[in-house]
From Swiss-Prot:
Function: Carrier of the growing fatty acid chain in fatty acid biosynthesis.
Any coiled-coil regions, as ranges: none
Location(s) in or outside the cell: Cytoplasm
Parts of the chain that traverse the membrane: none
Xref: InterPro entries: ACP (IPR003231), ACP-like_sf (IPR036736), PP-bd_ACP (IPR009081), Ppantetheine_attach_site (IPR006162)
Stated name of the protein: Acyl carrier protein
Residue ranges of every copy of the Carrier domain listed in the record: 4-79
Gene name linked to the record: acpP
Primary site of residence: cytoplasm
Amino acid sequence: MSQEAILEKVRSIVTEQLSVEAGEVKPESSFQNDLGADSLDTVELVMALEEAFDIEIPDEAAEGITTVGDAVKYIEDKQA
């Protein structure tokens, strides 16, 4: 899956999970600071990403995923 395809899928999941507009979801967008996610939202988002991409994101890795771009990079690395 290309980086662009991963970004589009992540963007779709983020807009649905956080009830934000797709235009607000950019690679540099912070889940908490820019998109208004709280800690529960973040956990639910990680679970949705795991399910959508059929991957497992350990807690240690999830703590380092703070932006949309971080999520895309992590998923890209897991699929490589």
